[in-house]
């Protein structure tokens, strides 16, 4: 979806690999599931917020865990947006668009 819309997408197999990639480059926004091997999305968000170089990076969590307790926990960790599956493609694109515009205004590559 995002590539089709012209965005450059960098993939990671899990949270640990995502953190490694974030040391190499800074995307405009991070999209993460909760359920991943080695490091889940909650731990990824916690690590991003604990890193002074990444702490303001927008995080969109996309997950099948739609219970309120999961959403609340994500928000407590600093997740910016929480989308339950199935989600609206337009909603996701709108969020990504807003974050990439903000990043472009700050000189961050989208």
Question: What is each model feature region?
Answer:
Residues 25-31:
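Active-site beta3 strand of CheY-like receiver
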Residues 87-96:
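C-terminal output helix
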Residues 65-66:
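Short, conserved "switch-loop" micro-motifs in signal-transduction and mechanochemical regulators
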Residues 1-10, 99:
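Two-component/phosphorelay signaling modules centered on CheY-like receiver
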Residues 36:
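Receiver (REC) domain active-site loop signature in two-component systems and cognate sites
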């Amino acid at each position: 979806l995002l590539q089709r819309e012209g965005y450059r997408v960098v993939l990671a197999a899990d949270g640990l690999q995502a953190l490694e990639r974030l040391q190499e480059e800074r995307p405009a926004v991070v999209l993460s599931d909760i359920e991943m091997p080695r490091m889940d999305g909650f731990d990824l968000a916690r690590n991003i917020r604990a890193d002074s170089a990444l702490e303001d990076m927008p995080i969109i969590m996309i997950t099948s865990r739609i219970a309120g307790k999961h959403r609340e926990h994500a928000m407590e960790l600093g997740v910016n947006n929480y989308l339950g599956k199935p989600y609206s493609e337009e909603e996701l694109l709108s969020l990504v668009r807003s974050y990439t515009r903000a990043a472009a205004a700050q000189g961050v590559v989208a």
